[in-house]
Amino acid sequence: MTKFENVTVVKKANIYDGGKVTSRTVEFADGTRKTLGIMMPGEYTFNTAEAEIMEMMSGELDIRLPNEDWKTLNTPESFNVPANSSFDLKIRTVTDYCCSYIK
């Protein structure tokens, strides 16, 4: 899906790590939500409450998911993150992403 229709976009940005990671929340009529964002080069750890599907639209990164070794992803790629976990990222180039939250 390259665009979303009939959605609500939350005006206030989600800002992490001093502005190096930012996103906007997109809410759908069925109650689901996604975030669209940009990650600048750097190393980050994120914690999840809900399961997530992370789609990388552009960029290059290394990821370490729970109980896994580091692996390199070149876009376009996606990965799943379990609920109530954390994952580590090493962003190599500016990375454009879409995060879908799974209930």
UniProtKB/Swiss-Prot annotation:
SUPFAM superfamilies according to UniProt: RmlC-like cupins
In short, the EC number is: 2.4.2.1, 2.4.2.2
InterPro entries to which the protein is assigned, alphabetical: Ppnp, RmlC-like_jellyroll, RmlC_Cupin_sf
Q: Which CDD domains match?
A: cupin_PpnP-like (cd20296)
Coiled-coil stretches are none
Q: Which GO terms describe its cellular component?
A: cytosol
Q: Which reaction does it catalyse?
A: a purine D-ribonucleoside + phosphate = a purine nucleobase + alpha-D-ribose 1-phosphate; adenosine + phosphate = alpha-D-ribose 1-phosphate + adenine; cytidine + phosphate = cytosine + alpha-D-ribose 1-phosphate; guanosine + phosphate = alpha-D-ribose 1-phosphate + guanine
Keyword Transport in the entry? The reply is no
Q: Which Gene3D superfamilies match?
A: Jelly Rolls (2.60.120.10)
Example of a GO MF term: thymidine phosphorylase activity
Keyword set, alphabetical order: Glycosyltransferase, Transferase
Please give the family membership noted in the entry: Belongs to the nucleoside phosphorylase PpnP family.
Q: Which PANTHER family match?
A: PYRIMIDINE/PURINE NUCLEOSIDE PHOSPHORYLASE, PYRIMIDINE_PURINE NUCLEOSIDE PHOSPHORYLASE
Query: What job does this protein perform?
Result: Catalyzes the phosphorolysis of diverse nucleosides, yielding D-ribose 1-phosphate and the respective free bases. Can use uridine, adenosine, guanosine, cytidine, thymidine, inosine and xanthosine as substrates. Also catalyzes the reverse reactions.
Supply the HAMAP family for this chain: Nucleos_phosphorylase_PpnP (MF_01537)
Report the protein name in the record.
Pyrimidine/purine nucleoside phosphorylase
Provenance organism = Sulfurimonas denitrificans (strain ATCC 33889 / DSM 1251)
